[in-house]
């Protein structure tokens, strides 16, 4: 129905929801048809300790939106050690933009390129603007992703 109107349905896997882990994503994708897409979020998948590269490879044909978000590894490891909730981790600054965290986007960009991905790709940080200047971090993310995209012959 939505597809007939040119509006594909995408589900955003996200911590704190019913679809957050790799297993949740697998089950969701198995229970839905090819007209239901996945909004692929690197930061939330890594936070869920998912194999985010495997998820991308397995579902690339049903991904129509990518949130490029990164994780501050030290904050993430402290969150695990201290058994913090997702909300507490978020408030402590676990998320950042690509190029400022620990996710290597080069293999992910390579998969997107090999599969001729031409859909949405956005930079997302989910961080406190009082602690991390949005423009400054947008530039960090843009520069990092631009380099990774150009290495795979994507044009911006």
Spell out what each predicted region is.
Residues 75-76, 129-132:
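Short active-site-adjacent structural elements
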Residues 69-71, 100, 106, 110-114:
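Catalytic-face loop-and-helix region of soluble metabolic enzyme cores
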Residues 132-155:
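C-terminal helical cap(s) of enzyme catalytic domains, especially alpha/beta-barrels
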Residues 1-9, 107-118, 148-155:
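A structural motif corresponding to the C-terminal end of an alpha-helix
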Residues 1-98, 156:
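Acidic/histidine-rich catalytic cores of soluble enzymes
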Residues 122-126:
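Short acidic/histidine-rich active-site segments
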């Amino acid at each position: 129905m939505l597809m007939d109107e040119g509006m594909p349905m995408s589900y955003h896997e996200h911590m704190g929801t019913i679809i957050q882990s790799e297993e949740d994503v697998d089950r969701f994708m198995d229970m839905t048809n090819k007209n239901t897409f996945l909004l692929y979020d690197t930061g939330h998948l890594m936070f869920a300790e998912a194999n985010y590269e495997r998820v991308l490879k397995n579902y690339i044909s049903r991904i129509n939106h990518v949130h490029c978000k990164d994780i501050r590894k030290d904050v993430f490891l402290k969150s695990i050690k201290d058994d913090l909730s997702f909300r507490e981790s978020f408030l402590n600054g676990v998320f950042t933009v690509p190029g400022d965290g620990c996710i290597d986007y080069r293999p992910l960009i390579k998969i997107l390129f090999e599969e001729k991905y031409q859909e949405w790709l956005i930079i997302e940080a989910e961080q406190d603007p009082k602690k991390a200047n949005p423009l400054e971090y947008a530039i960090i993310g843009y520069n990092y992703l631009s380099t990774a995209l150009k290495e795979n012959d994507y044009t911006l």
